[in-house]
């Protein structure tokens, strides 16, 4: 544990703070802006030119997508721009500090996208939780079942968790029929949420973006899930395809995958995107 974290756990650190921001136009995309969050360790700004090209392989105007763990909108806005005003993105983000920036990004791009923000944590039941964070701007954290002295999260935020599929059916039933893409990054809850959404995923081909753990156990769990639903997967980094994910490979750090069904109506387009990238 770092000295700074120890002092924060002792109550000697600064309180939770909402940092200032700057709204800047995105070069090359007319009418699109990005809200830069001016925290000590800001998240990287997405390359929206690459993002729009990437997501256009399987999304189009009128489609809907779901982003679970939307953070400040860095994984939200790209697909939302492709879905356009006639479609949209349902973005789950329970953390009020990051949701503030997410809502700004949704608002400044309202003329060219449609982002519906859900201020709840996704799960498989309805309950209240406490999320813990290690930094006073609360950028990266979540619910932990161990002592704060183990995980180092000195800053707490109380959030409401919902049964994800039940909530979506009640609040977004028409949009749910048009969902083509789901991204999940919810700390330790990813697999719980995936199982909760399995009926939706199995009802029609849905492109998935998932985080896979670096360990052999984590990778094999991901592979078992993909085999159980008959999906093909490729490792991705932002809007770039890296390589096919089909077996355990020793590595350092978790990674993202893009997974899709051979029955997906855009299968050929997605495969072309993936194979072209891995051959370059």
Question: Locations of the language-model features?
Answer:
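Conserved beta-strand termini and adjacent loop/short-helix elements that scaffold enzyme active sites
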Residues: 37, 118-120, 162, 211, ...
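Short, glycine/acidic-enriched loop or turn micro-motifs at the edges of active sites
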Residues: 70-72, 96, 122-124, 186-188, ...
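S-adenosyl-L-methionine
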Residues: 1-167, 169-177, 235-280
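Short internal loop-to-helix segment that lines adenine-nucleotide cofactor pockets
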Residues: 43-66, 128-130, 145-204, 215-220, ...
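A SAM-dependent methyltransferase catalytic signature shared across enzymes that methylate proteins
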Residues: 223-241
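Proline-aspartate-enriched helix->loop->beta-strand connector
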Residues: 205-210
């Amino acid at each position: 544990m770092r000295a700074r974290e120890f002092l924060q756990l002792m109550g000697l650190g600064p309180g939770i703070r909402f940092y200032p921001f700057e709204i800047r136009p995105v070069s090359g995309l007319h009418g699109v802006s990005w809200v830069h969050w001016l925290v000590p360790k800001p998240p990287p700004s997405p390359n929206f030119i690459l993002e729009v090209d990437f997501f256009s392989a399987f999304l189009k105007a009128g489609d809907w997508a779901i982003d679970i763990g939307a953070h400040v909108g860095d994984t939200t806005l790209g697909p939302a721009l492709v879905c356009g005003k006639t479609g949209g993105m349902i973005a789950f983000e329970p953390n009020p500090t990051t949701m503030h920036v997410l809502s700004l990004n949704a608002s400044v791009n309202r003329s060219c996208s449609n982002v519906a923000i859900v201020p709840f944590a996704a799960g498989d039941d309805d309950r209240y939780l406490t999320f813990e964070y290690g930094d006073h701007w609360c950028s990266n954290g979540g619910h932990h079942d161990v002592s704060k002295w183990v995980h180092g999260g000195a800053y707490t935020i109380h959030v409401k968790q919902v049964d994800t599929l039940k909530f979506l059916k009640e609040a977004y039933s028409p949009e749910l029929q048009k969902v083509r893409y789901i991204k999940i990054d919810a700390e330790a809850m990813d697999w719980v949420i995936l199982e909760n959404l399995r009926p939706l995923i199995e009802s029609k081909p849905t492109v998935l973006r998932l985080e896979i753990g670096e360990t052999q156990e984590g990778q094999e769990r991901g592979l078992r899930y993909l085999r159980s639903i008959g999906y093909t997967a490729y490792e991705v980094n932002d809007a770039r395809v890296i390589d096919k994910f089909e077996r355990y490979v020793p590595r350092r750090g978790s990674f993202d995958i893009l997974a899709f069904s051979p029955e997906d109506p855009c299968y050929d387009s997605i495969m072309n995107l993936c194979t072209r990238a891995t051959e370059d």
